[in-house]
Amino acid sequence: EVTGLTRKQLLPWRRRMQAVFQDPYGSLSPRRTVAQTVREPLDVHGVGTATERRTRVAELLDVVGLSAQAADRYPHEFSGGQRQRVGIARALALNPQFIVADEPVSALDVSVQSQVLNLIARLQRELGIAFLFISHDLAVIQHVSDHIGVMYLGKLVEVAPSGELFRKPRHPYTTALLSAVPQVRAQGSNRGHGRLVLSGDVPSPRNPPAGCPFHPRCPQVMDVCRTVAPVLKAPVGEPTRTVACHLEGTGP
């Protein structure tokens, strides 16, 4: 829990945790060169000499697939995908253990998304960095994730290994989400059951309903769902998965 830490107490954590932001156009200062942007974390934390910082910037640009000549250029001279690579290089500057990637490809063209996703996967594999990848794109999530946490109104409703979750969702909201993923089925195949359309409107997160937050739209709602909020628990026989649903016997 770091939300209660003071600015001074949080400083050591910032070296271990970094972020890649959704908007590659708004997350880079137009007045700073790429070198200044990538070097900023090193400057803030006083890492290395001026020469060592220049060397580190060149290394980081190479890691994310940008040439050394990019260092003296400005953000407006790059494409969206290249700008996001700059943002990733900045996040890597302090050798973090954990990176929050907040919708890092949603603002990019589809043709560029795969390049950035492959870069993130390579960094995760080669550098051993843990990524918290936030996205609403289920195809992207399936491509990059080892474990998936499904949230509804700011609450986790299911957490499972990626393959297990896509193969057999247990929470009704997860089931509805995955039913919206297009599937190619061979003639005569019974794989998939069509899209599950939820009724009603999404409640306000500021004033969520009592009990399970999903109960006003759940097609399998029970009386207990309207008054008692379920907690995340592992269903019987599935120790690698947790579900917050009374259907799975996960009441308090």
Language-model segments: what does each one mean?
Residues 161-252:
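Charged, flexible cofactor/metal-binding loops and thiol motifs
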